[in-house]
Amino acid sequence: MSRRKPYTLYAMLVLSALWIVFFLCAPYIAPFDPETTSVADRLQDISSTHLLGTDQLGRDVWSRILYGGKASLGIAFTIIGISGAIGIVIGGLAGFSTPRVDRWLSRLIDLVLGFPNMVIAIAFVGIMGPSITNVIISLCITKWAEYARITRGLVQIERHAEYITFARMSGASNLRILWRYILPNVLPPLVIVIIQHLGDAIILVASFSLIGIGVQPPDPEWGAILLSSRDFLQTAPWLLIYPGLA
């Protein structure tokens, strides 16, 4: 039986790749060093020299947005990669194991999902101290369960397919069936979910930085940029508008 080609997945991958490459090329695109200050150029409006103006220390806003995107992507990829790997492993085991193992792992997944992610993450960072490392750990602790639940459901659907029955009849082990046959079929929808969650992770990281417990100024990260510019909403609104739109 032929499967439809995942054109939606391909389109999302291409668009996401272009967006990611754009910000990863920040060192080659940015016209200025994001950390270079110039008191004489502070709080300048849009000009041919500074496309999005300058901040309170004379730093180029466009350059800081580009470097902030690069930093935000790196942090988000770390969170999605770690939590996704944990969730896929646990979800795969839950969906393919015995009913008893599935029951216990499902309870663990439901327990984690039962608590608000932000509340747990903020509490963890509040106890451990504000740092981007603690933000990453806290979000990995809370987000893996989302991928585990999705993976479990997809694996349970695939495990009853005819080709799995034929694989069992041919003598394939459970590990080989899971790795060789099931995972390749459940990964495409998981990739779409991960791409969608990449934006969520960026917003969460920026939110932590904005309330002062994530990336700390003067590091160029979108939330940290907004945090350092919050006092200039009336005198230099571009300092918040453009990073906020990014």
Predicted regions and their residues:
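N-terminal signal-anchor/first transmembrane alpha helix
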Residues: 1-32, 108, 187
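Short membrane-interfacial helix/loop motifs at transmembrane-helix boundaries
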Residues: 27-63, 212-213
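Generic hydrophobic transmembrane alpha-helix motif, especially the helices
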Residues: 51, 55, 95-96, 101-157, ...
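Short helix-to-coil transition segments within interhelical loops
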Residues: 54-59, 96-97, 166-185, 226
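Transmembrane alpha-helix signature in integral membrane proteins
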Residues: 61-96, 245
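Hydrophobic alpha-helical transmembrane segments in multi-pass membrane proteins
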Residues: 71-87, 114-122, 184, 188-205, ...
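Membrane-cytosol interface at the C-terminal ends of specific transmembrane alpha-helices
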Residues: 80-81, 88, 92, 130-180, ...
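Glycine-rich helix-loop "coupling/hinge" segments at transmembrane-helix boundaries
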Residues: 124-127, 154-155, 204-246
